[in-house]
């Protein structure tokens, strides 16, 4: 569990339960997202702040991970169709490295349609990280290679560099927009961005205004009612 209501707990999950959750998250959530935002829907990909990392294993070899990671792993074959981050990025354990690379591939995608994370606090972490690192990220887009300071396996880095390719025009555009300031930056660098998919409300609502500073009040949509224990429902 995430530990938002106390200490983290281990909840056993069967393959049947994984398939059930994956079916709803992979099929119904996009459908209801379309219903809510069809005026600007482009069928574009999104930036998803998640991973498919197995944290550890039991003595018997059963993998232990967050519910989100397990769910993402179960739909691994279609992840590249839904999200801008390559599979290799979702397999990185280090949080800062992961955020950097999630952003790098999202910044290359001028038609990004949505940003998604489990909790809105993660969205804010991402946007603050963008504020601190946008100059390095733009340089990487210009050169088509990942900054030397990003510590990742050399073979993984080689694979990702092949996917980047230099894009001076995109780098010039990003430099121009960031020079205007960070307020509303998301809507300016991703003009087709139409919603933020994440859990907010209640205790999380304190993050809304901080996120809105960067997004210029792009709608925040909580698509599902879910817990580690199981899928509860969809928010149409």
Where is each model-derived feature located?
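Phosphate/ribose-recognition catalytic cores of enzymes acting on nucleotide-derived substrates
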Residues: 1
